[in-house]
Amino acid sequence: MLICFMCDLHLPYNKNAVQYDVLDWACSDIKKKNADAVVFAGDFTADGNVFATKRFIRKIQALGIPAVVIPGNSDCRTQKNIPFVKQFVSPIVNKIGEYTVIAVDDSERTISDETFEALERVDEKTFVIMHHPYESLSGKISERFCEWRKKHPSVKVLYGHLHDSYEKDNDVSLQAADPDKAIGENPCITYYNTDTREFRKAYYFCPVPNDIYKYIGISCYNPVQDLEFAFEHGIRNIELRNSAKNIDKSEIAALITKWRTLGGTNLSLHAPDVFFSDETVGDVAEWDSFIEFASFLKCDRVTLHVPNVSVDTLRKDRSILEQITDFLAKRFVMLPEKCVVGVENMHMTSKDSADDTRRFGYIPEECAEFMKHLGRKCTRKIGINLDTGHARNNVPFSQKYTLGTWYAELGRFTVGYHLHQVVHGSAGFENHMPITELYGKLISYASFFAGWNAGILNKAPVIFEIRGTNGEYKPTIELFEKYKNKNVFDLHSHTLFSNCGRDKPEKVIATAISNGIKIFGISDHNYGIGDRKQQYLKKIRELAPKYSDRIKLLCGIEISTLPELFDINNPEEIHEYDYCLIENIMDDRGLVGGDLISFCSKFQLKCGVAHTDMFEYCKKHGYDPLEYFTEMAKHDSFWEMNVSYDSIHGYREHGYVKDFMQDKEKQRIVRESGLHISVGFDGHRCEDYDGHKVHEMYDFLKENGIKTADLLFVE
């Protein structure tokens, strides 16, 4: 039996948020893998929204398999909606075949006596599902559950809420499905196979987009020092603070000129705040000085916060908004003609109340309102400069307006971004901290990457707004440079040119790009292509330059070495490809026999051995693996680690790959031989593609000092 466990999806009210794409993906994955049941451990909504609840329940019911659902604390945030939400909660005891799932409703950190009574009847085939870790429940309830746990250590207890995953004994913390909040790794769902008694994760994979690096930049709190850093690291996007105008004009101009000469493309200047007091807008002298400085620098972009005026003030007197936008429009006309203006969202502070006395611009619709009002009066383009930290550190509004909601509602208007991490420190939540991991504790950038790849977010400058004058942004730049330098590759994929493939090359390539693949080889079957070889080769060759700014595209071909599928007398028909993959070499009927190297030399191009245990091949033919692999390396032959796990292959894994990853001696032999190892997902359906497995294998090879086959194709 296969059971799917999920938690912490946090569906918001906006159905265009990326969380709904995760739900669609999860349901599709559950169907493809023929799961027997689905169990959801709470927080299916962000704040108990009725419409989000209905959408979730409809999707789960449409699976047509047993489902167990419990609420989490987020589902109970809107008091008036709690009765509606809880009508969909499963009973305490749920039978799934010969297994039992005890559904513990601990959404308010308490557990009913009825539930404790059910817990006393558990056996080896029982799963206990709850939302919170039991140690975090209210005092006496936690003590009572811990006592029960001591008596039943063999029962599996699964929970969510932490947004991070771990397994200790039979306690299982489930990874969040929400790409806004999944900690430490990508959002995922978790399957449990009752036959093997193993958990396996399926990831909603959100890698760093291949094309984001040219948009990355820094906010300069120490302009001279920071611009020197930009020169050294090829940073093409720069934001200066308004205080930069205090630097000698000739000095700052020379620095900007040098930066542009070195490839700088987008210079932004952050504006002073806009105030309204005593019937007057802003500081006229300050603003005029800012506009003059922006024009002098020939800025490509300026950013400004929403007006520092209360919601109540603007609602009571609409003329104030008119005065503010008139004030700004009059000055923005003096900016360079192509200069873009980005309106930035703000956030709740300890001084604010969550009512109309707070500052305007804490929620998406207010930012959009101001942007559109200003845009109607300006000749310059007006958009949104979306600050992710401000959107996240915005309680209580962050519960309703999740990051995914901000992206869905304002993404099409964005002209830039401020990215940073929010950290919970001794003084409370702190913004503008370095991003030291992509999937952080308070902000996971998985949803940002997913939105970027899906076109929900416009491609625009991504500024790391890390405050400090001593290069506090450097760890963040280093983190992204590490990912930029990863040359993740996949040399085994199929299109509709193969009989077993289904998708057009364009769709296959787009899938690889969205999965963060840098070098991608399409390698359709020789026998499937048939007499269309020139058509196939021409098509892939024509597509390569079209996608060259996002991915390096190779055209390979996969050869079955069975005599009925390949004519060994015409090897020249393979010469024009970038490489070939060879399969069936262990088959006694095959054309290779014990002379793989000679066979490969006929094609006069790089050859790789696909989905084959080369140690077994050496054993079969009496070769010393180290010597044979060394000889293969001399001929630029490579060996594939096939990481396929898809519907075409029945979701089975190659044993030789798992064995290699666990066998240090085999790794040593390959490492010493200098043999290049390739990674191939062997994809036949785009919806099956699992980029996480490709990245995982690439990282494994690099971490173990094993040569990778991408090196054979990088000039």
Where are these regions (language model features)?
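Extended substrate/RNA-proximal surfaces in nucleic-acid metabolism proteins
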Residues: S289-L304, D312-R331, A354-L374, N526-M641, ...
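Charged catalytic cores and adjacent phosphate/nucleic-acid-binding surfaces used
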Residues: K381-G383, L419-G425, L479-L491, T495, ...
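N-terminal active-site segment of His-dependent metallophosphoesterases
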Residues: M1-R55, N485-N515
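Conserved beta-sheet core of the metallophosphoesterase superfamily
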Residues: A62, V68, S138-R200, M661-E665, ...
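Histidine-acidic metal/acid-base catalytic patches
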Residues: P207-Y213, V224-F231, I291-D300, V311-K316, ...
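An N-terminally biased module of ancient metal coordination in phosphate/nucleic-acid-related enzymes
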Residues: Y13, I30, N210-Y221, D226-S250, ...
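Binuclear metal-dependent phosphoesterase catalytic core
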Residues: A17, D21, D164-N210, V462-F464, ...
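His/acidic metal-ligating clusters that form di-metal
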Residues: A26-A37, T100, T110-N170
